[in-house]
Design a protein with these regions (language model features):
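Extended, hydrophilic extramembrane loops/domains of integral membrane proteins
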Residues: 151-189
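Conserved beta-propeller blade signature
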Residues: 65-68, 75, 110-112, 150-152, ...
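Repeated scaffold domains used in trafficking and secretory/extracellular systems
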Residues: 36-60, 93-108, 137-149, 286-298, ...
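Juxtamembrane amphipathic/hinge helix adjacent to a transmembrane helix
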Residues: 177-195, 217-232
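Juxtamembrane interface at the cytosolic side of transmembrane helices
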Residues: 1, 201-257, 262-264
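Loop/turn residues immediately N-terminal
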Residues: 71-75, 81-82, 116-120, 156-160, ...
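Alpha-helical transmembrane signal-anchor/signal-peptide segments
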Residues: 11-36, 262-290
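Beta-propeller fold detector
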Residues: 24, 84-90, 129-135, 168-183, ...
């Protein structure tokens, strides 16, 4: 298990490098299999009427066309669910690329879809085309919405707006709300410390090195436990295990302790606790909304935007980039 934890931890620490690598679900436990649209396979639907009827569907007698989207990409069906057709042509291959967060249709009929790694527009040759956007390193999209002819794309840290023909985007950094105190949850602090991301790429590399050290300790420990007949191999493994373990025990304990804290019951206490962000770390950001934005929708009744974040719900005035906390929300 330790070997598996170390290797998987290194890979997850550099997710962008392995996002094109896929593993068939048939090699995973049964709870990871898609059955009856479970596991986030169906996140939402979009009614597109009959305007988007593709050639292969011309003879299908159905009421309206629907797009279904989720962790498996996008699918075309009708209001009777009488068929399901793959609607992913043009999207990059790979499970990460096809985690579709939202699909919308603008008033002018144009259709956009967003995944954590890209924004796509449906158009020429009846397929998806990626929309080029300038993003910060490691920045990921979370949602997309529209009002009138204004397209709004939400990332984990910024709001992007665009007008026809939707080729250029304006990045908006939202102002801090009145109740902003700069504190972060203890859970997030421990999470970033465990991965090393708390100290940027340098911290990640250090944690990767610790994981490699743990791999060496596991291998040398297994060799010593097996007691090979070759005394030279036994002595070498014991020497390495002892020397490396002595010098790295503090770092190894740090990784083990922070990993243990990320699971219940300690995790619950950390989630409910807030502490000041540590100076000199990635948590101390000039952007008060760094890695906090999740969902955005236009509120027709209030004529503003409804913003969901890891800190709660807010009403948003995009023009002024100001937010106001909404207190009357479900617990």
């Amino acid at each position: 298990f330790m070997l598996m934890f170390c290797v998987s931890g290194i890979l997850l620490n550099h997710r962008s490098l392995i996002k094109e690598v896929n593993v068939s679900r048939k090699y995973l436990p049964s709870r990871y299999e898609f059955r009856n649209w479970n596991g986030g396979l169906l996140r939402g639907t979009l009614d597109i009427g009959k305007d988007l009827m593709v050639d292969s569907m011309r003879n299908v007698d159905s009421c309206r066309q629907l797009l279904l989207y989720g962790n498996g990409g996008i699918w075309l069906t009708d209001s009777k669910a009488s068929y399901f057709k793959d609607f992913n042509e043009g999207l990059p291959e790979g499970a990460d690329y096809r985690q579709i967060k939202n699909v919308i249709r603008l008033d002018n009929g144009r259709i956009f879809a967003v995944s954590p790694f890209g924004l796509y527009r449906y158009g020429v040759h009846n397929k998806w085309h990626e929309v080029n956007m300038s993003l910060e390193d490691e920045e990921k999209f979370t949602d997309i919405a529209s009002h009138g002819d204004t397209l709004v794309v939400l990332s984990r840290s910024f709001v992007y707006t665009s007008l026809p023909p939707y080729k250029t985007f304006k990045r908006i950094q939202l102002h801090a709300p009145k109740d902003y105190d700069g504190k972060v949850t203890a859970f997030r602090t421990v999470w970033l410390l465990h991965s090393g991301e708390l100290f940027g790429i340098t911290g990640k590399i250090v944690v990767d090195a610790i994981a490699i050290i743990l791999v060496v300790l596991c291998i040398t420990g297994i060799v010593f436990w097996l007691r090979p007949k070759r005394k030279a191999l036994l002595q070498t493994s014991l020497h390495l295990h002892d020397r490396i373990g002595r010098y790295t025990i503090i770092l190894a304990l740090l990784i083990a302790l922070t990993g243990w804290c990320l699971r219940p019951p300690v995790m619950i206490a950390l989630v409910l606790s807030k502490i000041p962000s540590i100076p000199g770390t990635t948590l101390r950001s000039k952007n008060p909304w760094n890695d906090k934005l999740r969902i955005i929708r236009y509120d027709e009744s209030c004529h503003d935007w409804l913003l969901s974040s890891s800190e709660g719900f807010y009403s948003l005035n995009i023009k002024n980039a100001t937010v106001k906390v909404i207190t009357s929300v479900p617990p």
